[in-house]
Each structure stands twice: as C-alpha cells, then as structure tokens.
Amino acid sequence: MRVATYASHSALQILKGAKDEGFETVAFGPSRVKPLYTKYFPVADHFIEGAYPEEELLEFEAVVVPTGSFVAHLGVELVEKMKVPYYGNKAVLRWESDRSLERKWLEKAKLRLPRIYEDPDDIDGPVIVKPFGAGGGRGYFLASSPEDFWKKAERLGVRSKEDLSRVQIQEYVVGVPVYPHYFYSKLNGELELMSVDRRYESNADAIGRIPAREQIDLGISTDYTVVGNIPIVLRESLLMDVIEAGERVVKAAEELMGGLWGPFCLEGVFTPDMEFVVFEISARIVAGTNPFVHGSPYTWLRYDFPVSTGRRIAMELKQGLEEDRLGELLT
C-alpha cells in the first residue's frame, strides 16, 4: 500500500507524515509542481502528472488522502465515483459542499451558528456573502444593506434573486477568527484536538494599514482570499468549548451520514463574550495544519514525538493495516 495525495494544499505535510510512518508516497498533479515534491522538498517517492491518474494509482495500490484542492479540482461527483480507495467517508462530501445540508448538520450538533438571510432585502445589519464551494475565501465580501449587497454581488454574477443559489448570506459575527483542527480516530473511537490557526487573508489583513479616508477615496473593497496561516494557542479555559463542539459534530455525523473520521476543522470566531460561533466545517485536512509539520503544543501534550495531522493520518492507516481493519477507514 502507498499513500497518495494531490500535489497542492497540504500535500507536503501528508506525504512527510506518511514517510515518517514508513509508507511509500505518491503525489499527482500538474508537471510544474513536480520539483516541489521531489527536489526542493523530497517527500514524494513517485510523481504522476494528471488531476486524477486513476489507472496509475490503482497499479500503485494507493490510498488517496483527500484535501480541499483535490475535491475542488475534481468535483464531488467524480470523487464519489473514483475507484481508488479513499481515506474517509465520501458521504460527508455532499454534506460539506451543500451549505443547506452543512447547516442541518451543524444545527443537529447544537452549535451556535450565524443567522442566514434567504432574501437580501431582509439584510438589517452587517453580513458576509460567500460563494458556494471551497475557494479559500475567494469572492467573499461584506455588505451592510440590501443596496450594498446588490452593488457588490454583481462582480460574482449575481444580478437577480434567481442567481442567489450561487451564494450564502451570513450574519457577520464580530469576534476573533479561530480554526481548531481535529482528528477523530475511527479505530480508537477518540477525538483529538490537533492544533489551531487563523488565516492570513488578502486584503483583509492588509487593509488596516491604509487610513480610512484613503480607503474611501481609493474605493478599496475588502477581500478574504487566504494566502497563509498563523498558529494560535487558545486560552486554556476555552479548550473545552472547542473540544465539546468537535465531539457533537462527530456524533451528529454518525446519525446523519454514517460517520466522520479522520481530520476536520470547525471554522468560527470567539466573540467578546467568549462564545464560540461556528460558520463552517471542513470535513478533511485543512491548510491551517501546515504550520505544525513538527507537531503542535496540543499534540506534544498527547504524544512524546512530533505528530502533524498528516502523520496522524498515516498512523491511523498503519494501525488499520496492523489490526487488519484498513477496510473500515476507506470508501
């Protein structure tokens, strides 16, 4: 068995973790990035050109570890039909990618969620508008009124209420962005808090360097495209809030779609009242785990060796092989 993943997003971490656990590794993707994984950071034993070289991956007896880039490039329907063994529950993809199903899931988990506006004409306070699909924050924008919404939505091709299926309009909750990363072991039945990050976004994290008057004169609009990730260590008194939220999400997934296992992330904010408000779930490894290739403060508290989320995936696959339970982890 070899561990394979698409050459983008968090592939360096996934492949490094797999090699640390003794697996042979395979990266696949565009030819331009081959040196990144074989020369500059030699974590891939094999590199295959192509978005999804199914026959070659089957010949390698590979298990694909999904990332956001892989799902975004192939699309949910193709991933659901792929023949190469897939680490995780494919049924989760529909629930993650459909914002109405995602909300049903998070509501069942009894998480505090922002209000959703079905009609832009009902906007009565600050909102954040998000196009559907994983795009790393690309296309997000803020609006404060129905008029402001329609003016800014045009750049996304949303010109009438018939186009609203392309976006979700969320209450903008003021607070500190926090992205806790979890790992649920299906073999051990345990949830682990792996790490926490916040996103470094363009131009949201740079716009504060421009005085307000110049922002208005220049007509600058805020954008939330992710360019990197910054590690966070939470106040210890907040950890149980985060962990309990993760436990409830796993329990709800068991009832709705047959389970969620492996890595996932709850994307949210802590308000000034220290309330954890969740606005999204990423049901796979997220790029926010990349600062922790050598482990995080939380994994060092649990393990006495460096464990990244990528390595934790490989540890689970290795345990599955050793216990003859690998089939329980794959779909």
Curated annotation (Swiss-Prot):
Q: What family is this protein classified in?
A: Belongs to the phosphohexose mutase family.
Molecular-function annotations in GO: ATP binding; ligase activity, forming carbon-nitrogen bonds; magnesium ion binding
Q: Which GO terms describe its biological process?
A: 'de novo' IMP biosynthetic process
- List, separated by semicolons, the cofactors it needs: Mg(2+); Mn(2+)
**Catalyzed reactions per annotation:** 5-amino-1-(5-phospho-beta-D-ribosyl)imidazole-4-carboxamide + formate + ATP = 5-formamido-1-(5-phospho-D-ribosyl)imidazole-4-carboxamide + ADP + phosphate
Q: Which UniProt keywords apply?
A: ATP-binding, Ligase, Magnesium, Manganese, Metal-binding, Nucleotide-binding, Purine biosynthesis
Q: Where does Mg(2+) bind?
A: E267, E280
* Listed pathway(s): Purine metabolism; IMP biosynthesis via de novo pathway; 5-formamido-1-(5-phospho-D-ribosyl)imidazole-4-carboxamide from 5-amino-1-(5-phospho-D-ribosyl)imidazole-4-carboxamide (formate route): step 1/1
Which residues bind 5-amino-1-(5-phospho-beta-D-ribosyl)imidazole-4-carboxamide per the record? H9, S69, N229
Described function: Catalyzes the ATP- and formate-dependent formylation of 5-aminoimidazole-4-carboxamide-1-beta-d-ribofuranosyl 5'-monophosphate (AICAR) to 5-formaminoimidazole-4-carboxamide-1-beta-d-ribofuranosyl 5'-monophosphate (FAICAR) in the absence of folates.
Official protein name in the record:
5-formaminoimidazole-4-carboxamide-1-(beta)-D-ribofuranosyl 5'-monophosphate synthetase
User: What PROSITE patterns does this protein map onto?
Assistant: ATP_GRASP
Q: Where does ATP bind?
A: 120-179, 201
Query: What SUPFAM superfamilies does this protein map onto?
Result: Glutathione synthetase ATP-binding domain-like (SSF56059), PreATP-grasp domain (SSF52440)
What Pfam families does the database record attribute to this sequence? Answer: DUF1246, DUF1297
Q: How is the cofactor bound?
A: Binds 1 Mg(2+) or Mn(2+) ion per subunit.
Give the EC class as a word. ligase
